[in-house]
């Protein structure tokens, strides 16, 4: 009977068949589970690049599993249909297997390259790990550096900086010992100055020329040195297997503007030596980042030491400066006290000396106008001349005193320059004629007629210079030339610091006084401007010295921004005095405002003041008597009082002039003047008020003008001066020049 079945090709063995059946079943289960796992993990992976390969591989496995599953039914008698299914499954499996095999030819190289990339990435990851380790090490080193720098910079004391450095380095690097060797001031040795553990005596020295020291000083890097080197023998006895030792130089920065104690000389090596030791008996070694840390700290210590040294020297200089300031302040106060004492003394002496001088000159001038024998007249004239000379000397002493302490100032105003020179010439001519000396004035026409300056002081300079020329000339001539100097004639090779600058607002007056007198030794010329200087060659002769005249003149010339000098070719060859002063040029708008200089009538010497009622207020009875004698001699009706109250009580409208001493102790004479104004009201109803005083200071004059006085005259006063004062008062109602 045909059942469309295949007979088995060998006898069935039940046991073998049973094993094949079980094996095919598990193979089929395994083949079916593998694609499921592949599908699961492929879905979980979003970046897998071989999805089609997995599909083919999965189909191959599924078909292989299907063939094994079908074999479960083909191991026994089976139908033709099952055989066709089995054949179809194997054919498909063969096709898919070949396709998968062909695909693997292209895939396997990629899979191998993936492995290569994996190894590359692993190497890269390891390299990154090393770099990250270096970065972490650098960050840690930087943190240590910042920490150490902060600790080092937290103070500006050198000793604290160095101790802090050793302590912080020892703590950060776990050192057994850390030491600092400082150069001695001569720079020939290194001295152990600081240690961390204090196990060695401070002050131990080693020569600076040791090879190991030269090796360290020759580089700015930390250098490993032998533990047995002289600078590294800092461990306690009994230690063996010493740890590694490094040394680094610490620059001691050059401080050119400071002289600092304990700092090496500039000619020596300006380094300190820092030695660092790892613990003994350990296998620890110095790492690169630790050496870098040591190098950075050494540089920071160098900067901190320089700052501390500068601060230390600045504080020392400040203390020294404070001491000097205290000493200078004390000296200044003492000098001010001395100046005040001198000024007070001069003021008192001035007032006290002028009072008797007033009596001498006044009485001598009165005697001069009486009938005298020639011998008596000669004696009176000698007394009067000597008294006038003494009064001039008193004025010079006061002027010099005020010039030296800076209290004297120029009284600047507009004046007639030509008139000033003619006045000087008129004053000098009588003296020159007595000595058979011809005096003349030249070149004045090329000077401006009016100028701005201190007329009184310029006249004083001229009188001093011309007076000296006449004084030292027995006969011959004295010539005075004055010009508005040009730039080329202003310089003096002996005074290069004098460098005048021309402008439109001022000019420089150049005055030259040339005489044919005794001349001067060239070596004596610089001494002439000293106080009471004498020409040594002429010191025994009657001419004497220059007194204070030239010394005062030089200071006045300096106040006028000028220069003065003297030239002479030697003894017997005459001399030339030259001075230059700066004067202002009045503007056109100021010309109408030039002060009117009235001329006294030519016959004022013959004027009489018969019946003129005058009141004198002076506490000094002797001075009252002398002043009264002058006025009575001139014909005045004189009343004298000794106090302000008496003055106000006695004073009436009949009195035309009041002379009052403004230096009466216990009386405010300025207040008396104010009360006189109040008593008589309008100006034309009151008497003229004149201060008769021995005080020559500017304050006295300003106070007199402030309270409305009509003039100030200084003691001593002669008959001629009193006559001139009264004439000026009665004609103009004011004294134009004191």
From Swiss-Prot:
SUPFAM superfamilies: ATPase domain of HSP90 chaperone/DNA topoisomerase II/histidine kinase (SSF55874), CheY-like (SSF52172), GAF domain-like (SSF55781), Homodimeric domain of signal transducing histidine kinase (SSF47384). Residues 613-730 form the Response regulatory domain. Cu cation binds at residues 64, 68. It comes from the Eukaryota. It is a multi-pass membrane protein. Homodimer; disulfide-linked. GO terms for molecular function: ATP binding; ethylene binding; ethylene receptor activity; metal ion binding; phosphorelay sensor kinase activity. CDD domains: HATPase_EvgS-ArcB-TorS-like (cd16922), HisKA (cd00082), REC_ETR-like (cd19933). InterPro entries: CheY-like_superfamily, ETR, GAF, GAF-like_dom_sf, HATPase_C_sf, His_kinase_dom, HisK_dim/P_dom, HisK_dim/P_sf. Its cofactor is Cu cation. May act early in the ethylene signal transduction pathway, possibly as an ethylene receptor, or as a regulator of the pathway. Induction: Constitutive expression. Not induced by senescence, wounding, application of ethephon or infection with virus. It is found in: Endoplasmic reticulum membrane. This is Ethylene receptor. Residues 348-585 form the Histidine kinase domain. Activation probably requires a transfer of a phosphate group between a His in the transmitter domain and an Asp of the receiver domain. Residues 157-305 form the GAF domain. The gene is ETR1. Keywords: ATP-binding, Copper, Disulfide bond, Endoplasmic reticulum, Ethylene signaling pathway, Kinase, Membrane, Metal-binding, Nucleotide-binding, Phosphoprotein, Receptor, Transferase, Transmembrane, Transmembrane helix, Two-component regulatory system. It catalyses: ATP + protein L-histidine = ADP + protein N-phospho-L-histidine. The modification 4-aspartylphosphate is found at residue 661. Binds 1 copper ion per dimer. Belongs to the ethylene receptor family. Coiled coil: none annotated. GO terms for cellular component: endoplasmic reticulum; endoplasmic reticulum membrane.
């Amino acid at each position: 009977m045909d059942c469309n079945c295949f007979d088995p090709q060998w006898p069935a063995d039940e046991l073998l068949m049973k094993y094949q059946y079980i094996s095919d079943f598990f193979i089929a289960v395994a083949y079916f589970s593998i694609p499921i796992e592949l599908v699961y993990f492929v879905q979980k992976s979003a970046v897998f690049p071989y999805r089609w390969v997995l599909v083919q591989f999965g189909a191959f496995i599924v078909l292989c599993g299907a063939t094994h599953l079908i074999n479960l039914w083909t191991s026994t008698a089976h139908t033709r249909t099952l055989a066709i299914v089995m054949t179809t499954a194997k054919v498909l499996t063969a096709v898919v297997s070949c396709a998968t095999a062909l695909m693997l030819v292209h895939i396997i190289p990629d899979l191998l390259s993936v492995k290569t990339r994996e190894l590359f990435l692993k190497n890269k990851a390891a390299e990154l790990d090393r770099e990250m380790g270096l970065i972490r090490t650098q960050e840690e080193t930087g943190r240590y550096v910042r920490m150490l720098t902060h600790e080092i910079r937290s103070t500006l004391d050198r000793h604290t900086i160095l101790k802090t450095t050793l302590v912080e380095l020892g703590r950060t690097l776990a050192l057994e010992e850390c030491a600092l060797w400082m150069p001695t001031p001569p720079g020939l040795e290194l001295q152990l100055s600081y240690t961390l553990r204090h196990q060695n005596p401070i002050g131990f020295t080693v020569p600076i020329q040791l090879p190991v020291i030269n090796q360290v000083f020759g580089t700015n890097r930390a250098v490993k040195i032998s533990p047995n080197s002289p600078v590294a023998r800092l461990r306690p006895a009994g230690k063996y297997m010493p740890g590694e030792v490094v040394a680094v130089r610490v620059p001691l920065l050059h401080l050119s503007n400071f002289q600092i104690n304990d700092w090496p000389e500039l000619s020596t090596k300006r380094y300190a030596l820092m030695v660092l030791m790892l613990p003994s008996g350990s296998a620890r070694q110095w790492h690169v980042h630790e050496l870098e840390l040591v190098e950075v700290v050494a540089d920071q210590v160098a900067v901190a030491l320089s700052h501390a040294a500068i601060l230390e020297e600045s504080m020392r200089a400040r203390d020294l400066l404070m001491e000097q300031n205290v000493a200078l302040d004390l000296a200044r106060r003492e000098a001010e006290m001395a100046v005040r004492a001198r000024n007070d003394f001069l003021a008192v002496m001035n007032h006290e000396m002028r009072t008797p001088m007033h009596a001498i000159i006044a009485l001598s001038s009165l005697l001069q106008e009486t009938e005298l024998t020639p011998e008596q007249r000669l004696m009176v004239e000698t007394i009067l001349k000597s008294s006038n000379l003494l009064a001039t000397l008193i004025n010079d002493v006061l002027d010099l005193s005020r010039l030296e302490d800076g209290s004297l100032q120029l009284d600047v105003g507009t004046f007639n320059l030509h008139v000033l020179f003619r006045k000087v010439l008129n004053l000098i001519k009588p003296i020159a004629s007595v000595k058979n000396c011809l005096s003349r004035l030249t070149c004045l026409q090329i000077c401006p007629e009016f100028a701005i300056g201190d007329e009184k002081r310029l006249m004083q300079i001229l009188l001093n210079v011309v007076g000296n020329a006449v004084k030292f000339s027995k006969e011959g001539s004295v010539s005075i030339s004055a010009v508005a100097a040009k730039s080329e004639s202003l310089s003096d090779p002996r005074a290069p610091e004098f460098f005048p600058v021309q402008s439109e607002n001022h000019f420089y007056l150049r005055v030259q006084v040339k005489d044919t007198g005794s001349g001067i030794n060239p070596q004596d010329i610089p001494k002439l401007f000293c106080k009471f200087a004498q020409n040594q060659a002429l010191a025994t002769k009657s001419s004497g010295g220059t007194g204070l005249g030239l010394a005062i003149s030089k200071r006045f010339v300096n106040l006028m921004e000028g220069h003065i000098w003297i030239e002479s070719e030697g003894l017997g060859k005459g001399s030339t005095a030259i001075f230059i002063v700066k004067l202002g040029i009045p503007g056109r708008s100021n010309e109408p405002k030039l002060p009117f200089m009235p001329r006294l009538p030519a016959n004022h010497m013959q004027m009489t003041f018969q019946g003129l009622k005058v009141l004198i207020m002076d506490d000094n009875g002797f001075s009252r008597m002398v002043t009264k004698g002058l006025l009575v001699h001139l014909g005045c009706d004189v009343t004298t009082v000794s106090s302000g109250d008496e003055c106000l009580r006695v004073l009436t409208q009949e009195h035309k002039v009041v002379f009052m001493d403004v230096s009466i102790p216990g009386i405010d004479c300025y207040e008396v003047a104010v009360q006189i104004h109040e008593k008589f009201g309008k100006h034309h109803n009151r008497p003229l008020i004149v201060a008769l005083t021995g005080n020559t200071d500017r304050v006295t004059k300003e106070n007199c003008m402030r309270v409305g006085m009509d003039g100030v005259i200084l003691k001593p006063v002669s008959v001629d001066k009193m006559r001139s004062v009264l004439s000026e008062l009665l004609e103009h109602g004011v004294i134009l020049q004191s």
